[in-house]
Amino acid sequence: MVNFNQFLKQAQTMQKKMQEAQEQMANTRYTGKAGGGLVEIIATGKGEVEKVSIDASLLKEEEKEMLEDLIKVAFNDAKQKCDADSQNSMSGALSGMSLPPGFKMPF
């Protein structure tokens, strides 16, 4: 059985590592691209869009629907990169913890 004081110390260490990982994620920028770079979105680790870049060739009425699709694809690309990085960061923060068998984390 794990000593309660040891468990508390591990929990404090895990909390500190998770806070550091969250701060690092918040300061990281993710670039999502679509249409071979015709549309780019830069988002923060918090999922906030900072910048949208659209190639001038897409700014025509007949390209409206394609542009809307490319913006969606670029945003989802940036979000997927952020989510993958978040999962890796949180997994790293939890390494070395003695968690009970079957314990699932909320992320």
UniProtKB/Swiss-Prot annotation:
Keyword Transit peptide: no
Alphabetic keyword roster: Cytoplasm, DNA-binding
Subcellular location: Cytoplasm, Nucleoid
Keyword Cytoplasm in annotation: yes
Chain segments annotated as coiled-coil in the UniProt record: none
GO MF terms held by the record: DNA binding
SUPFAM superfamilies: YbaB-like
GO cellular component, one term: bacterial nucleoid
Source domain of life: Bacteria
Chief location: cytoplasm
Family annotation (InterPro entries): YbaB-like_sf, YbaB/EbfC
Subunit structure: Homodimer.
Family indicated by similarity: Belongs to the YbaB/EbfC family.
Role: Binds to DNA and alters its conformation. May be involved in regulation of gene expression, nucleoid organization and DNA protection.
UniProt name for this protein: Nucleoid-associated protein RBE_0048
Source species: Rickettsia bellii (strain RML369-C)
